[in-house]
Amino acid sequence: MRLIALPAFDDNYIWALVAADGRAIIVDPGQAAPVIATAEREGLVPSAILLTHHHGDHIDGVAELQQRWPGLELFSPADERIPTTAHHVSHGERLSLLAVDFQVIEVPGHTRTHIAFVTDRHLFSGDTLFSLGCGRMFEGTAPQMFDSLQRLACLPGETLVCCGHEYTLANAAFALHVDSTNAALQRRQQEAQAMRHAARPTLPISLKSELATNPFLRTNRPEIRAVVAARAAGALSSEVDVFAELRRWKDEFCL
């Protein structure tokens, strides 16, 4: 299977997994136009859509795509804010699409019904795990988001993270503010700057790299805990407390 990142809006990515015969699985199509343009240019035929959550920048292209390809199947979490034509999937379920096996993982936090789709090579994490960051908690709690990230962190290190937005450079600035002596993080920032200068996506990225550089996956590290505790002006009794304070810090952070 070939993986294609389709830019949408200002910083979204729609993902396409493409079989040798041109049939494709589309993940989080917030816009129809990038999918249609790619299909026309490369001879793709979308056969299924996977949705991680209900936000418009991830689902608003669905109706137009289903009109263009009437047989298109749709899989999503059970959420009244998602088109009713979807097949609802939940934690632990497995799908076999175009000879690819997908596992569904529940990852609430960004939204209350957010899910991720995992294959033997790829993690489609939506707005839960980002390159060098994580999503804002619009509907969930810090313990929920922390648990969701820990669930994803247990996947094999070679898994490629395919998230919903190109946030790497902005996230790198915050990550280095927190973890300034991390040499791997410094290298990632330099690599990402070169990629973006060349108009290339910084994604996908290996989970192994995220575990070494993403502060939201490193809340057990003494250097992270110390910096976050200093900002909080007091002891933080658990990793969840560290995560919650780190997420608050990121929400307020500006260069």
UniProtKB/Swiss-Prot annotation:
Residues bound to Zn(2+) 2: D57, H58, D127, H165
SUPFAM superfamilies: Metallo-hydrolase/oxidoreductase (SSF56281)
Stretches assigned to coiled coil: none
Gene Ontology biological-process entries: methylglyoxal catabolic process to D-lactate via S-lactoyl-glutathione
EC number of the protein: 3.1.2.6
SMART domains membership: Lactamase_B (SM00849)
Keywords of the record: Hydrolase, Metal-binding, Zinc
Cofactors required: Zn(2+)
Binding of Zn(2+) 1, residues: H53, H55, H110, D127
GO MF assignments: hydroxyacylglutathione hydrolase activity; metal ion binding
UniProt keyword Zinc present: yes
Cofactor note: Binds 2 Zn(2+) ions per subunit.
Reaction(s) catalysed by this chain's protein: an S-(2-hydroxyacyl)glutathione + H2O = a 2-hydroxy carboxylate + glutathione + H(+)
Pathway: Secondary metabolite metabolism; methylglyoxal degradation; (R)-lactate from methylglyoxal: step 2/2
Subunit structure as annotated in this protein's UniProt entry: Monomer.
Biological role stated in the UniProt entry: Thiolesterase that catalyzes the hydrolysis of S-D-lactoyl-glutathione to form glutathione and D-lactic acid.
Family: Belongs to the metallo-beta-lactamase superfamily. Glyoxalase II family.
Protein name: Hydroxyacylglutathione hydrolase
Organism of derivation: Xanthomonas oryzae pv. oryzae (strain MAFF 311018)
Gene from which the chain derives: gloB
